[in-house]
């Protein structure tokens, strides 16, 4: 008696999957208002992770370390020593123009 051992193989090759190929969405961090720029109260000055730039005069810090203006005025970025920076907002005097 003749016994045959018949093996069938897949006719399509199995395709492996990669563990790469995805990326996180950008967080849009950075300076939003430049030095000398006029800002309104509530405007965001800097979006950051951690206190890379510290809040100065008339500047608040949000829960995610975002710096924002507390008053209307002009933004000024200043150095604190060698390695620290701070952002301040100084009030500007508005001159009223009277039409004659």
Curated annotation (Swiss-Prot):
The N-terminus is cleaved by ribosomal processing cysteine protease Prp. It comes from Clostridium botulinum (strain Hall / ATCC 3502 / NCTC 13319 / Type A). Belongs to the bacterial ribosomal protein bL27 family. NCBIfam families: L27 (TIGR00062). It holds the Pfam family Ribosomal_L27. InterPro entries: Ribosomal_bL27 (IPR001684), Ribosomal_bL27_CS (IPR018261). The gene is rpmA. This is Large ribosomal subunit protein bL27. GO terms for molecular function: structural constituent of ribosome. One of its GO terms (cellular component) is cytosolic large ribosomal subunit. Residues 1-9 form a propeptide. It comes from the Bacteria. GO terms for biological process: translation. Keywords: Ribonucleoprotein, Ribosomal protein.
């Amino acid at each position: 008696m003749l016994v045959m051992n018949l093996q069938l193989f897949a006719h399509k090759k199995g395709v492996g999957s990669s563990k790469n190929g995805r990326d996180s969405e950008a967080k849009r961090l950075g300076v939003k208002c430049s030095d000398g720029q006029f800002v309104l109260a509530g405007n965001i000055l800097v979006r950051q992770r951690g206190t890379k730039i510290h809040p100065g005069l008339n500047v608040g810090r949000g829960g995610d370390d975002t710096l924002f203006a507390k008053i209307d005025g002009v933004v000024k970025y200043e150095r604190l020593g060698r390695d620290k920076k701070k952002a301040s907002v100084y009030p500007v005097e508005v001159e009223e123009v009277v039409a004659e």
